[in-house]
Structure formats: C-alpha cells, structure tokens
Amino acid sequence: MRPEIAVLDIQGQYRVYTEFYRADAAAKTIILVNGSMATTASFAQTVKSLYPQFNVVLYDQPYAGRSKIHNRHEQMLTKEVEGQLLLELIDHFAAEHVLSFSWGGAATLVALAHRPRRVEKAVISSFSPVINAPMRDYLERGVDYLGNLDRDRVGHLVNSTIGKHLPSLFKRFNYKHVSSLAEHEYGQMHFHISHVLNSDRLCYLKAAKQIDIPVLFLNGEWDEYTSAQDAKLFGQHVANSSFSTIQATGHFLDMEHKAACRDSREAVVGFLKPQRQVNRLRYHQGQAQHAFAI
C-alpha cells in the first residue's frame, strides 16, 4: 500500500506535501485533516481503516512535516488560510468526503462553510466549540511552554493531558516528535493557541450554520478536553448533524486500543457508507511515528 506522493503548489503561495492512496475499486475519495503539530504519520491507523474502501488523501500543513522544507515560513497561517488550502485540495483530488482530527476541525469547519460542491459528507473527530476548564488549563500551559521554547515540558504536557490514554509506545513517539519540532512550528502553535484563548469560539458555530451536508461528530467517552457533551452544541447549528461517542477511549480515539480502533472505524464507515456492512479490520499498533495534535 504505497501512496502517490506529490508536492502541490497552492495559489503560488504555499507548497503542500500530499499522499494519495488510490484504490481501484473505490468509488469515493476522502481527505484527512490532521491536528496541530501533527503530520501525515498521525493518520497511519486511520488509513488502514479506510483503505481500500475509499481513496485516501493525506497532507501536511505548509509549516509541518514534509511540507515545511518547501516553504519559507515568513508569516503565520490563520485558520482561514488553512481552510482555503483545504478547499484547494478538495478540488484538486475531487474529494467527496472530509475527516478531521482534533484542531483540524477548525480549518474543516471554515472550509465546509463555503459549501464546496463536491463534498457530500464530513466527519469531525475530537473537536468541540467549547473551551472547558481542562482544555483552558492545557492551552494556557501550552502557550507558556511554547513561548519559552521549553521542549521537554511541551512533550510531557501532551502525554499527561490529551494523550494520557495512549499506549506507552505512542507516548514515546509523541514526546520525540514534539520536542524536536522546528522553532517556526512552535511559533505557529503559539500563534494558534493565543488566538483561541483570546477570540470568540462562537466563530466555529457561525461557520457551522453555513454547512449544508451531513456531518458526524465523533468523540471519545473519556476525552475531557473535547468532550462528547460539548460537541453536541454543534447540533443546534449544523442542520444535518449526528453524534457518536467511542466508549472507553480518550482524545486520540483509534490510536488508543483495539476496541477503539474497531469502533471508530465502524462509526466512520457506517456514516459514510450506511448501506454497506462494516468489515472488521485487524488493529496495527506500531507502523509509523504518530504525531500528536493540540
């Protein structure tokens, strides 16, 4: 299962590394939107769950992963810009579905509010419109550690909060990845978090009101940072919304254990292809480094 790799020029401003997993029998294409500080590697398990039922597209933000060597990093990217990048990729790959994880939900909501004509359904996982007390504490500590380039504390912060239910192997991957990021990546994350802490989260609900396709909101039962209960606020704004809670799992859903992997896959595929019976897929734990998402 080798992807077709390309670095795409987006509007002459950004170059974006992409991986396209083409499945000959697949009728639909899904693009995956990762979270902050994450790379394409963070979706290794998700790709295995969706391929070959779908063609699968992964990409790295211009400041991250294998995109960053192709860009100058002269200015911070806003969520609006990330949303526009996603719209360009949806058009380029003719994607009918979008699946986001964690902070990737912000750019996805921005993109979907533009009502891209090709997109039929979307899944937004581990995201909520609420900054509750645990999330605020996490973000406030994060912006402090990032601002001081305290790599050790940033790495441990993730594993002791949103990543606390991950297997120890993935925690080691997370720590290694986060503590070795480039300075401009820390700057980008500091910019994002500062904006979240000082802005009106109602902007996500306003974007949600413009969405005219079915959206599944997927959250973990044990995730106290983007809780299933908080995510249900989207139901008052997305006209065609549904909700699924993955039992006995936290923020990282399918990465955390076999049952979470199975249940996440069944929820996603059951939503995207409700007429098909979901086949169970064996869980693969250690395939690639799994980057984390703020």
Which functions belong to the PLM regions below?
Residues 14-69:
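Conserved HGGG/HGGXW glycine-rich cap/lid loop of the alpha/beta-hydrolase fold
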Residues 58-99:
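Active-site loop/oxyanion-hole signature of alpha/beta-hydrolase fold enzymes
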Residues 100-104, 108:
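Gly/Ala-rich beta-loop-alpha elbow adjacent to hydrolase catalytic centers
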Residues 113, 121-150:
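Flexible "cap/lid" loop of the alpha/beta hydrolase fold
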Residues 222-226:
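Acidic catalytic loop of the alpha/beta-hydrolase fold
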